[in-house]
């Protein structure tokens, strides 16, 4: 079973993401912000993927990804954002961006592509 960390500061959006992933058979750990998510990355060595909002309080998604990659350089990251032009920084290779709003099927398809690309 794939274990995914879902990071989203808007509770209703986070619930939708968690339910979508769980219904698809994934194990899901959730966090309301980047700081909480980073603590989970440190404590959970078997994470397969991070799905994170870009703009959040305390720590944005790009910072979360950079710090998480210091711990787990191979950990894939899928960014979600409602802001056009949010490109993945060059120092986060292999990460992808999913534009909000998105259909749950689009989220699952993006995750499938990222998981299939893992070594």
Task: Please state what every model-predicted region is.
Residues 53:
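Active-site residues of response regulator receiver
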Residues 15-23:
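Charged docking surfaces used in two-component/phosphorelay signaling
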Residues 5, 30-49:
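Acidic, metal-coordinating helix/loop segments flanking the phosphotransfer/catalytic sites
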Residues 80-81:
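Hydrophobic/aromatic residues positioned on beta-strands within the core alpha/beta folds
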Residues 33-36, 59-64:
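Acidic catalytic/metal-coordinating carboxylates
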Residues 56:
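Receiver (REC) domain active-site loop signature in two-component systems and cognate sites
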Residues 18, 102-115:
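C-terminal output helix
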Residues 8:
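Conserved acidic carboxylate
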């Amino acid at each position: 079973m794939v274990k995914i960390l879902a990071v989203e500061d808007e509770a209703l959006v986070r619930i939708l993401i968690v339910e979508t992933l769980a219904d698809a058979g994934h194990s899901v750990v959730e966090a309301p912000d980047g700081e909480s998510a980073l603590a989970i990355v440190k404590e959970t060595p078997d994470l397969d993927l991070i799905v994170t909002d870009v703009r959040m309080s305390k720590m944005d998604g790009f910072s979360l990804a950079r710090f998480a990659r210091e711990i787990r350089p191979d950990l894939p990251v899928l960014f979600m954002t409602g802001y056009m032009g949010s490109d993945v920084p060059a120092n986060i290779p292999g990460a992808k961006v999913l534009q909000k709003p998105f259909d749950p099927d689009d989220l699952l398809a993006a995750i499938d592509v990222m998981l299939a690309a893992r070594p």
